[in-house]
């Protein structure tokens, strides 16, 4: 990844404002998509639970996707990005 910021003692400085704004926008889209996907997965898991399909491949795959998504969101939160 090409950095668009430089870290200094007082914080961060941008090297290319337009490129940084573009990347920030894409990052925000990613965060929105992750949060939306987590909600959709939770709804789908609940539907499968109600059908008694908690041992199905679909349920296990969705549960794994939810865990990965939650890990990513937790990591973003730990950096105060959400």
Predicted regions and their residues:
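Extended, charge-rich alpha-helical interface modules
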Residues: 2-82
């Amino acid at each position: 990844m090409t950095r668009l910021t430089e870290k200094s003692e007082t914080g961060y400085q941008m090297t290319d404002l337009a490129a940084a704004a573009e990347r920030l926008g894409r990052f925000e889209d990613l965060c929105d998509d992750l949060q939306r996907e987590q909600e959709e997965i939770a709804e789908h898991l609940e539907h499968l639970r109600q059908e008694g399909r908690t041992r199905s491949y679909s349920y296990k795959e969705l549960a794994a996707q939810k865990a990965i998504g939650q890990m990513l969101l937790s990591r973003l939160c730990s950096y105060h990005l959400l």
